[in-house]
Amino acid sequence: EEAESYSDEDYQVSVKWSKINTEGKRSYQRCYGAPFQIQISGSGLVAPCGMLFNERYSRFHIGNITQQRFKDIVNSDRYWEVMNHLASPNFDAQTMCGSLCLQHKVNEFLDGYKKGDILLEEPKGTPPNHINFV
């Protein structure tokens, strides 16, 4: 709440309360958000998320932009092996992921859509601040 108090007419602080208040708990088991927000470490490592940069998660490492083009990495079989694994029953986001996941809201939406709980319809009202907002 203190952070929000720094907002003024020229600067807005937007706290993601819905994300913070979940305390890292997830209603979904699969990670569908990784292809929408893939991450690159400071050393060039490409992985589904920052939590997986650690060497102990090397099975999720997709490539390194210091060794091959990003385009080649995301068009590779390895990319889809990792993405398909994250969306499979062999991966459980509830027990295998850290808290404050960047893909959390995307995962909530896509999981609801996949289960039929969320229907896609033409947007109504004021457009979001950015086309990628879910």
Enumerate the predicted regions with their spans.
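Flexible mid-to-C-terminal extensions adjoining Fe-S/redox cofactors in radical SAM and related proteins
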Residues: 26, 45-134
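Conserved C-terminal portion of the radical SAM core fold
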Residues: 1-20, 39-43
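Structured beta-strand/loop patches that form or line metal/cofactor-binding pockets in enzymes
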Residues: 18-40
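Generic structural signal for secondary-structure transition and capping sites
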Residues: 8, 36, 78-82
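A broad, low-specificity signal for short, low-complexity segments enriched in glycine/proline
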Residues: 8, 24, 31-34, 59, ...
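Small-side-chain structural scaffolding
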Residues: 3, 33-34, 49, 63
